[in-house]
UniProtKB/Swiss-Prot annotation:
The protein's name in its UniProt record: Large ribosomal subunit protein eL30
Superkingdom to which the source organism belongs: Eukaryota
Source lineage: Eukaryota, Viridiplantae, Streptophyta, Embryophyta, Tracheophyta
Annotated organism of origin: Lupinus luteus
Keywords annotated in UniProt: Ribonucleoprotein, Ribosomal protein
HAMAP family found in the cross-reference section: Ribosomal_eL30
Length: 112
């Protein structure tokens, strides 16, 4: 019971930090733009939904490893990630270029 409550709390805090990035920071949404930001070494943190296709996920993780960027696996599907970003569409992956006022990069170092 306590563990489920704690994960819900951290899930909400991630959503709040993500909303702050959407307001005050710079980000890219989508697979192609995430790969572009990784190739140009602009991305600081990558967030991937849990239902991202395995080939796509492994390719993003490979580019992130080359660029030495943290990858966070979001604990929700692409609809949940899109809602957390404040969008009305599905978001499979996103790259945070500039966190703005949010401390999301310090709190989510990535699952590497």
């Amino acid at each position: 019971m306590v563990a489920a409550k704690k994960t819900k709390k951290t899930h909400e805090s991630i959503n709040n930090r993500l909303a702050l990035v959407m307001k005050s920071g710079k980000y890219t949404l989508g697979y192609k733009t995430v790969l572009k930001s990784l190739r140009s070494s602009k991305g600081k943190l990558i967030i991937i939904a849990n239902n991202c296709p395995p080939l796509r996920k492994s390719e993003i993780e490979y580019y992130a490893m080359l660029a030495k960027v943290g990858v966070h696996h979001y604990n929700g599907n692409n609809v949940d990630l899109g809602t957390a970003c404040g969008k009305y569409y599905r978001v499979c992956c996103l790259s945070i270029v500039d966190p703005g006022d949010s401390d999301i990069i310090k709190t989510l170092p990535g699952d590497q």
